[in-house]
């Protein structure tokens, strides 16, 4: 499938607006902010799957594909790739809808990554996953 025909994978787990306080020296949205939104979105899905607390333990193969501008709508999609004894592997994508910058209305994938979360107990130790209660 060509990039032009690519569709988001998974469900939308987070939607926000890129703001001026998140720009880098080039005037684009800082990649670290994008990564933090991806971690939040992935953690939401991981918490729903685990039925409790999770901790991010690793990020694999993060790719920043296109820049993001101030005022763009940032959509975070996530889907579960694998469930282990205590770990959850989540594919996360950031899709951008252009509102204030050209071309208006364009929708594209700006970043993608694999996040690994571990279900944890009240003391922060890994715990066995509970059966999925939703999704």
Curated annotation (Swiss-Prot):
Entry's Gene Ontology cellular component terms: cytosol
Annotated HotDog ACOT-type domain ranges read 8-123
GO biological process annotations for this chain's record? Answer: acyl-CoA metabolic process; fatty acid catabolic process
**Top EC class of this enzyme:** hydrolase
Q: Which InterPro entries match?
A: Cytosol_ACT, HOTDOG_ACOT, HotDog_dom_sf, Thioestr_dom
Give a GO molecular function annotation for the protein: long-chain fatty acyl-CoA hydrolase activity
Domain of life, source organism:
Bacteria
SUPFAM superfamilies to which the protein is assigned, alphabetical: Thioesterase/thiol ester dehydrase-isomerase
Record-linked PANTHER family: ACYL COENZYME A THIOESTER HYDROLASE, ACYL-COA THIOESTER HYDROLASE YCIA
Name of the protein in its database record: Uncharacterized acyl-CoA thioester hydrolase BU274
Source species taxonomy: Bacteria, Pseudomonadati, Pseudomonadota, Gammaproteobacteria, Enterobacterales
């Amino acid at each position: 499938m060509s990039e032009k025909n690519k569709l988001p994978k998974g469900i939308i787990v987070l939607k926000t607006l890129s703001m001026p306080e998140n720009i880098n020296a080039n005037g684009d949205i800082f990649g670290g902010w994008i990564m933090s939104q991806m971690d939040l979105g992935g953690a939401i899905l991981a918490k729903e799957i685990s039925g409790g607390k999770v901790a991010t333990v690793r990020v694999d193969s993060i790719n920043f594909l296109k820049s993001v501008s101030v005022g763009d709508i940032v959509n975070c999609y996530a889907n579960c790739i694998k469930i282990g004894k205590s770990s959850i592997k989540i594919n996360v994508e950031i899709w951008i809808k252009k509102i204030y910058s050209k071309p208006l209305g364009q929708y594209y994938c700006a970043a993608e990554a694999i996040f690994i979360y571990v279900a944890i107990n009240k003391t922060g130790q890994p715990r066995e996953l509970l059966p999925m209660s939703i999704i």
